[in-house]
């Protein structure tokens, strides 16, 4: 169970909720602020002054006053009308993370919902009631309206949810878990759907997967360095200290540790006629390290956003209810674009290492396409082509999304972030990157084995052994698709990187 303190939740907690399915609830000390804001909204609803989302219409209809007798129906109508999502549903793990993020936002005590709204969300998370949320339809301002409406629909007994391995109507799913739908009070529907939690959940998932890929890239690229008998001189700490970037320094240190004790490296330390390795070998710390720095910058933004109150209007500490723009997901959009760039570049340089290893003119005496009998066998020829295809896909997906705004809601909402699909694409990019890195691992393992009787280092030998437990050495040609998939799984689960048994850079 993760006890979430609003404003203080950590990325480690959020990753545990997403990756491990940990349950989550708010710390009890959040309740007084939540209830105080709810009382302030109730007072506003009983008054005559117009308060957006309490006794007015929404968006372009904000100037229309709603009668006190209709405020409950107003909130219900809001949820129903905004359930306009399309496409495949969110992955359940990401949907649950989104729900936890909504808890954190409501827990700041600035949204004006009653504690029973918080309690129902907590109950759904505890009982495994996961709303079915179509993943397309948000432009990332005014918040992630459509997807969050599908979440809120289940809370009022509408929509659909998965529970106990079954997909049920919302009311039935709640009943299955011993929960009851809630009748929304003033502003509560708006508070549930106005926010960036959908985009942020997807961006965090991309971040967590991206960091694991970066760790794998360091390990696999070290194995590739030994496969082509690359130099470790460019990893010397003095070089990286003179530049000063933290990620570069860490990447070089990690690779030095991974290659320490390699007999392959020692065999060509003297008398090697090659003066410099190609950039994809020599500049690995500069590229992967820079990607790590970018991922950490994105992590800082997303950690802040995860703890933010992104509702509108907000109940301020002095009791005033004020309209603002915290629902605009521009920070999330920028973070997603940064993550996309990092994923693309990690894959781009990895693909060049694959290309280098299969090319006998560059691989320093490795056989063409890493097959023991080239000509009769094509070896890893088309595996390299697959990595090129996936690299190109990722390059296209790395184009920024925050620059593509369009006006909506009759020009009232005239600039939007497009953070939602900017964050969603990260899942596809990570899938592609895992295949690129897994294929590199297969090539590197094959290359290192061709250097026998010389052996790689102990840490990299353990990595090679872990790979070989899933992917046999390639002799005669065989169908390679299962091998590529198995290697990609080792990358995504972190098993390949962990096999080295060395500390790896932490997010």
Swiss-Prot record:
UniProt keyword Cytoplasm, yes or no: yes
Subcellular location: Cytoplasm
CDD domains per the UniProt record, alphabetical: PAL-HAL (cd00332)
Enzyme Commission number(s): 4.3.1.3
Keywords: Cytoplasm, Histidine metabolism, Lyase
GO CC annotation: cytoplasm
PROSITE patterns reported in the protein's UniProt record: PAL_HISTIDASE
Residues the record lists as 2,3-didehydroalanine (Ser) modifications: 142
Annotated family: Belongs to the PAL/histidase family.
HAMAP family in the cross-refs: His_ammonia_lyase
Protein name as catalogued: Histidine ammonia-lyase
